[in-house]
Each structure stands twice: as structure tokens, then as C-alpha cells.
């Protein structure tokens, strides 16, 4: 595998940092996940999302933690920190989302250990960045990414309340960015032997994702947009005859208008100077949306899909998460896969969104139980059985 021989130590919880470490594990790195004695907090969150959350079936934990070894260590104890240091001494990459103040209390913040481990890549998820008035504020996907980052406001219908957003969306993009940054630093290490501090914040990830809208806002482009008054009538959503919705994305208005008008049988639009070029259209958007909307109600989504595909015009049907579970395109490309849990039930999980043609997909190793590999890992660090048992008795470790 691509990252065979790379060692990753993960001290994190929930989604953003764990999914980064999982990607590295998916690509062949050895990942050791450190959980507290009680386990990662996401292990008990399934019920909030109507999902199983038992030791025998826990898809929310599984999604972020497959292809890892799991150890359970009390890193607030002196002995636990000692074990952590031994792990870091052998690691190429350290992935964490623990806040800087907490890392400082343990003596493992970047500035405290960079000289001790000069080749270590210290990769950290932050809420709001390293500086500024919010640098110490806890950041979550819902807050730092969606709310403060402007994403919630961008997906609401104008004049309505902010959207109740999809959990984990921003976390996964932040994790993907951290994985990319970590690998760039790993390349530098291969050349120089020197480590690096890599940070990705949820807030910055949102700002980057919203970059087009943020940069155009200074020139008068406003968000949120109403679907009835978008930037272009050919770049919005429409309801079809069967009640399903379609997204048009005809971003080159002048180029595609003629072909589209023929598809919807409204060629008279091309003779109307209010609509037949982009310069005049921008002053009559709502009127043209009504015309197109009436046309789209004449056929079902499947009927429009066939006609638009034949015309080679960009569009897509709007799907739900339930639809995606059965999406033939997703299954054909191995974007999804099935896992049988210890409970005997089979569920669908999502693969990391990067494919390597020659390497293929690594054979999946299920996410660990709490402390499943504690003994194995401690022995590899030189601890004998008696010492490990003493650690367990004093609640330094769990297995």
C-alpha cells in the first residue's frame, strides 16, 4: 500500500481528526488510536441519529475508525503520558483534535515536544485557528464550520430560518484537508528528516469552501439566494410533475439557452430580448424562473432526465440520503461498501473519497473495541505482562 511503513498515532475524538487518521490507515499507514478509558465520545452518539451504538454494531464509530488499532490509555495520568511519549517516539505523524491548553497540561503541545521529536509531523484540527480571540474556543462542525463559517446561511431559502445542517459534513472536509497537509509534510520529512506542525481549522475550511461567495460578496453578490430569484434561471432547482426536484447547472447561459429552450419546448424565449442574452436576463430573472418552472411541471423527473441527457445539458436529480443507499453509480465505483457487524446485521458504510487505480482499496479491518489492542501495543513498546496488568489495575489502561 502507498503508506506502508508510515506510523500514525491518533489522540482524538468524534469525527474531524479521526477521519483524517482513518484516511491514512486506508492508504496503508499503521494507525494507533488512543481512546480514554471510557472510550471515544462518538461511541455513544448513535442514538441521537437513530443508529445502533453497541459494541457489536456501531456504524457512527465504524465510519471514522476502521483500519486502526485501538488502545485505551488515561493520558491524564503520569504513566499514561509516559506511554504516549513512547508511542510518539516511534511515530511519523501525530493526529489530534485535543485543544492546545489540554495538550499543554499533559506536556505534549507542539512547542513542548518539537525538539524532543524533531522528525514528528504534528497534525492538529482546531476550531477557529491558532490566533485571535476565539483560538481557545471549542469548535464543532455545527458551530465553527456551518454557523460562523457562513455555510448554514448559504443553504437556507431566502427569508426562512437557517438550515438544520448535515452532521459531520464540515468535519470530513477538515479531515481531508489535514490528511493532505500531513502527507505534504511527510514528503518534506522524507527529503530533510524534519517534522512540521500542520493545522486545519473548521472555520477556515468553511471560509475556503465558501470562497467564491465570500469574494463576490464584496461586489454585491448576496447570499442566501432564493430559488425563485437566483443568479440565473438556468442555475436553480425546479419541481417536476411527479413532485421530485431537479437541479439545473447551465452555467454558460448564452451558450446553452437555445438548446435548453428546445428541450422544454419554449423556443419563443429566444425571440424575447428580455431573456435571450445574459446581459438583459439578469434584470428579469424571476419572470424567466416562472416560465421555466411551469414548463418543468409538465414532465416527471425521469422524463426530464432522459431529455436533458440526450441534449448533453448539465443537470442532476436531487437525492436524499435514503436514495444514495441504493445509488447504482455509487455502488459501481465502490463509493459505498457493506459490512457485517458482530451483531450479525449488515450495514452500508462510505469509502474514503480518493481512489488509486493500481493500489485498489485496502482490505477493510473493522474498527477496534475499546482497548482491543492495548496489550499488543504495550508489549511492542517493551512493557512486560506484569507491568501491563499493574497499569490496568491502577486504571492507567483498559483492555
UniProtKB/Swiss-Prot annotation:
Under catalytic activity, the entry for this protein gives: 4-methylpentanoyl-CoA + (2R)-hydroxy-4-methylpentanoate = (R)-2-hydroxy-4-methylpentanoyl-CoA + 4-methylpentanoate
Pfam families found in the cross-reference section: CoA_transf_3 (PF02515)
Q: What class of enzyme is it?
A: transferase
Q: Which UniProt keywords apply?
A: Transferase
Highest taxon, organism lineage: Bacteria
Q: Sorted alphabetically, which InterPro entries does this protein's record hold?
A: CoA-transferase_III, CoA-Trfase_fam_III, CoA-Trfase_III_dom3_sf, CoA-Trfase_III_dom_1_sf
Q: What is its EC number?
A: 2.8.3.24
For molecular function, the Gene Ontology terms on record are:
transferase activity
Residues at the catalytic site = 171 (nucleophile)
| Pathway noted in the entry | Amino-acid degradation; L-leucine degradation
Q: Which family does it belong to?
A: Belongs to the CoA-transferase III family.
Q: How does it assemble?
A: Homodimer.
Q: What does this protein do?
A: Involved in the reductive branch of L-leucine fermentation. Catalyzes the transfer of the CoA moiety from 4-methylpentanoyl-CoA (isocaproyl-CoA) to (R)-2-hydroxy-4-methylpentanoate ((R)-2-hydroxyisocaproate), leading to the formation of (R)-2-hydroxy-4-methylpentanoyl-CoA. Other CoA thioesters, such as acetyl-CoA or butyryl-CoA, are not accepted as substrates.
- Protein name as it appears in the record: (R)-2-hydroxy-4-methylpentanoate CoA-transferase
